[in-house]
Amino acid sequence: NVIIVCLLAITSCENNPNSYKPISSGNIHTVTVVMENALWNSEAGEHVRTVFASEFVGLPQQEPLFSLKQIPPSIFSDFTRESRNVLVVSKKRKDTFKITKNKYANPQVVVEVYGKTNKEIIDQINLHAPKAIKAIRQNEIKEKQRRIRKSVFKSEELKELSIDLSLPSAYKMHKKEKGKKLWLQRETEKGSVNVLIYLLENRKNQTPVNKAKAIKIRDSIAKIFVLGRNEKSYMITEKAYEPYFFETKIKGMQTVETRGTWEVKNDYMAGPFLNYIIQDTINNRLLVMEG
């Protein structure tokens, strides 16, 4: 029996190539860029920064898509190989692009871009950047979810609304309206981070949600639920900045995403928001979530 257990252990290790690899490390949304210093300072390096550190669309303040940390290949060894996201860019005889998962650590995404000249490297980046960005973003979402699962906010109210949502335990219930609206809040050094959840009836033959309708929905709810400090003050969508509007899917359900800036009418408060309106066909409702 002992021999069988040992054989099973050996077999499982051989069948799992990630079992002996170190755990990856790094800050969220950080990419280690492996490039020669001269190449990093060339037009190819400038293009890497333009594409992978571009401004995140829809925020009032500038925030890069990823934080880039460049190192030359000569020091890419040992612990530097354990970065969760790695982008290798180098000159080689053959144009190449590939994405490898868990190459040096686990979990990890390694993106490799090669070309004979700066122009060919830039062409490779232009051709494959969407795939690379998607792979890194998915890796970061999984890492963020892993960190959240260490200490999860638990709420009977979420269960009653048939909502499975993972949030850090630092969030507390700030305000609620039974069966319809929840306001969760996490205190920070500079203020607070808020998550709003509310349900709307999904009427038959209603018009699809477009940008104007999404703004109308959030403003109508905020006027009665998200009140300001002063009398007759409440949250509205700031009109000075045109919100960004996208169509996407969450768990296979049609979703519209709106990014913009909120402000408080009759008060001096403002900030960014990210709003999702989800067509919850399972429960025949519109699920609206905003942070």
Spell out what each predicted region is:
Residues 18-35, 90-153:
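Solvent-exposed alpha-helical segments and adjacent loops
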Residues 9-12:
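C-terminal motif of bacterial Sec signal peptides marking the signal peptidase cleavage site
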Residues 1-5:
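Sec-dependent signal peptide recognition
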Residues 64, 71-115, 119, 223-284:
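Signature of long, low-cysteine stretches enriched in small and polar/charged residues
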Residues 22-26, 41, 50, 54, ...:
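N-terminal "mature-domain start" segment
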Residues 53, 57, 134-137, 141, ...:
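Sec-exported extracytoplasmic/periplasmic mature domains
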Residues 17-67:
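N-terminal mature-domain "stem" immediately C-terminal to a signal peptide or N-terminal signal-anchor/transmembrane
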Residues 17-18, 38, 168-228, 263:
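Secretory pathway targeting signatures of secreted, lumenal, and periplasmic proteins
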